[in-house]
Amino acid sequence: MGTALDIKIKRANKVYHAGEVLSGVVVISSKDSVQHQGVSLTMEGTVNLQLSAKSVGVFEAFYNSVKPIQIINSTIEMVKPGKFPSGKTEIPFEFPLHLKGNKVLYETYHGVFVNIQYTLRCDMKRSLLAKDLTKTCEFIVHSAPQKGKFTPSPVDFTITPETLQNVKERALLPKFLLRGHLNSTNCVITQPLTGELVVESSEAAIRSVELQLVRVETCGCAEGYARDATEIQNIQIADGDVCRGLSVPIYMVFPRLFTCPTLETTNFKVEFEVNIVVLLHPDHLITENFPLKLCRI
């Protein structure tokens, strides 16, 4: 089997907060004794910003300046050069998650154009004839709960052909009236988005009603900025011609890692929106957009 390197983090869910201590063990397993030139462990947190293809042409100068933003970087030497015995060797480690100056530990977030990631990397250096060994492991950071009281912000909405924007042929749209409400557009990330929708009337048959969660990522610097909206998830809340006057529940859970508390910094922004999408026969698409503010309490 050769020599295997592994990193085991103490917490099963791998979730940590600023100010806590990240601890665990590095495990070296081998059938025979292993000669090595030292073992080191690096903790790194970075924000990777990427521009969409449509922006690259416009922002060539800007493209080069979107380099990863380092949040945290720390390396410790775990073992000096020597020899590991055969079998399994466990080396404990501890990393305090403290930041110098006014840096902030942003929450882990996997987006399309903004990626916030925290990793542990263990390197075992070996002699020229044997290959160096490397093992990487991701851990998750949750931002501190927001200070102050959380206040919900309910929204009532009415959708008719007259309320729609960006409609070229308004006269060609069938008549319809949809009402509903969202219980709050200020959302706690660990709680679902809820509300209800009622189809009061519609001349055309309804094919489907969907909820679409959208991320809006903005990357920018002195030369300009690029703003891109992409879909995170799409949930169908009604299929077929919905009964008129029937209350259709709106319920959406925010997915882990793909959402984070709404974030705004000097270099990038991560915001979220929800679209209520109604498909009418034959192929009319009605969309109502609601900006959301996500937070952790």
Swiss-Prot record:
InterPro entries: Arrestin-like_C (IPR014752), Ig_E-set (IPR014756), Vps26-related (IPR028934)
Cellular component GO terms, alphabetical: endosome; nucleus
Free-text tissue specificity from the UniProt record: Ubiquitously expressed.
Source organism superkingdom: Eukaryota
One Gene Ontology biological process: intracellular protein transport
Keyword list, A-Z: Endosome
Quaternary structure annotation from Swiss-Prot or TrEMBL: Component of the commander complex that is essential for endosomal recycling of transmembrane cargos; the commander complex is composed of the CCC subcomplex and the retriever subcomplex. Component of the heterotrimeric retriever complex consisting of VPS26C, VPS29 and VPS35L; within the complex interacts with VPS35L. Interacts with SNX17 (via C-terminus); the interaction is direct and associates SNX17 with the retriever complex. Interacts with SNX31; the interaction is direct.
Record function comment: Component of the commander complex that is essential for endosomal recycling of transmembrane cargos; the commander complex is composed of the CCC subcomplex and the retriever subcomplex. Component of the retriever complex, which is a heterotrimeric complex related to retromer cargo-selective complex (CSC) and essential for retromer-independent retrieval and recycling of numerous cargos such as integrin alpha-5/beta-1 (ITGA5:ITGB1). The recruitment of the retriever complex to the endosomal membrane involves CCC and WASH complexes.
The protein, known as: Vacuolar protein sorting-associated protein 26C
Name of the gene: VPS26C
